[in-house]
Structure formats: structure tokens, C-alpha cells
Amino acid sequence: DASFHSWG
């Protein structure tokens, strides 16, 4: 889970 990245 890459909730640090920023997609969407």
C-alpha cells in the first residue's frame, strides 16, 4: 500500500 505516493 503506497499511501505516501499520491495517485488520484
Curated annotation (Swiss-Prot):
One of its GO terms (cellular component) is extracellular region. The modification Glycine amide is found at residue 8. One of its GO terms (biological process) is neuropeptide signaling pathway. This is Leucokinin-4. This cephalomyotropic peptide stimulates contractile activity of cockroach protodeum (hindgut). Keywords: Amidation, Neuropeptide, Secreted. It is found in: Secreted. Its main location: secreted. The lineage of its organism: Eukaryota, Metazoa, Ecdysozoa, Arthropoda, Hexapoda.
